[in-house]
Structures are given as structure tokens and as C-alpha cells.
């Protein structure tokens, strides 16, 4: 399989109080985004996202980029079905023209965004991922 993704962040490491709930939540959203997830009873790894069990010291905002609005909608619905809590349904935002996003809280209260930038793309050039 080969994917082309924009890059801005090297990696994000989250702690989850309930790793199984986080595994369900992230597998649902990342499955819609066609991102492979590897997990066991201690970890979840999906590209630059690493999650392990432990106590949180703070919450984060994490945004996943998509190539179209339909994928934003689908990922938001998948996240809700997998135990996420609505934090702003799919729609245009005023950050810049064409910014279309949806927000959910993951099982640990992190603010998860799925975004399509539309014509005003500001992401880095894509890299080729082969696995």
C-alpha cells in the first residue's frame, strides 16, 4: 500500500486512562482515513500517533487532515459511534475560506479534529509512505 500525506508534525504521544476505549475510538476514525493502526494490550501506533496507557497530565488538540469534506463527515460519525463525544459537528469554520472540519472529544477528553482545508491549503508537501 502507498499513501501520500502532508507533514507538519513528527509525532504525537498521548496517554489513555482506558486504552481499550482509545483503541476503538482511534481505529474507527483512522480506518475511515485509511491509516493503518497497530495495537496490543499496552500500545497503539498509527503513523505518527502513539498512545499508551497511563495517567494524563494535560489534554491536547489533534487534527487529522483529509482530502475531501465527505471524509470529514464519515470520520466524525465513526468517532461518535466508537464512543467519542461531539465537540462541533461537520461544517465550515471561519479560520480561512474552505476550512471544513468536525470536532470530537476522545475517551480521555482530548479535542480531536478532522479537517479538509479546501482551496486554501496550507499543509506541507506530501511524503510517500509505503508499507
Task: List PLM regions with ranges.
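C-terminal "cap" of GNAT-fold acetyltransferases
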Residues: 3-9, 40-55, 131
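Core segments of cupin and vicinal oxygen chelate
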Residues: 13-50
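Vicinal oxygen chelate
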Residues: 17-19, 64-108
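Helix-adjacent hinge/juxtasegments
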Residues: 54-55, 60-66
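N-terminal beta-strand motif that seeds the catalytic metal site of vicinal oxygen chelate
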Residues: 1-20, 62, 118-131
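Short beta->alpha transition motifs characteristic of CBS
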Residues: 97, 103, 114-121
Amino acid at each position: 500500500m502507498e499513501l501520500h500525506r502532508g507533514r507538519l508534525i513528527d509525532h504525537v504521544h498521548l496517554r489513555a486512562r482506558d486504552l481499550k476505549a482509545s483503541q476503538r475510538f482511534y481505529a474507527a476514525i483512522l480506518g475511515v482515513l485509511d491509516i493503518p493502526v497497530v495495537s496490543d494490550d499496552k500500545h497503539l501506533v498509527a503513523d505518527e500517533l502513539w498512545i499508551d496507557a497511563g495517567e494524563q497530565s494535560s489534554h491536547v488538540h489533534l487534527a487529522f487532515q483529509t482530502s475531501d469534506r465527505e471524509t470529514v463527515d464519515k470520520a466524525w460519525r465513526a468517532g461518535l459511534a466508537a464512543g467519542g463525544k461531539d465537540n462541533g459537528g461537520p461544517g465550515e469554520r471561519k479560520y480561512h475560506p474552505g476550512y471544513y472540519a468536525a470536532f470530537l472529544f476522545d475517551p480521555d477528553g482530548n479535542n480531536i479534529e478532522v479537517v479538509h482545508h479546501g482551496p486554501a491549503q496550507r499543509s506541507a508537501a506530501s511524503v510517500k509512505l509505503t508499507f
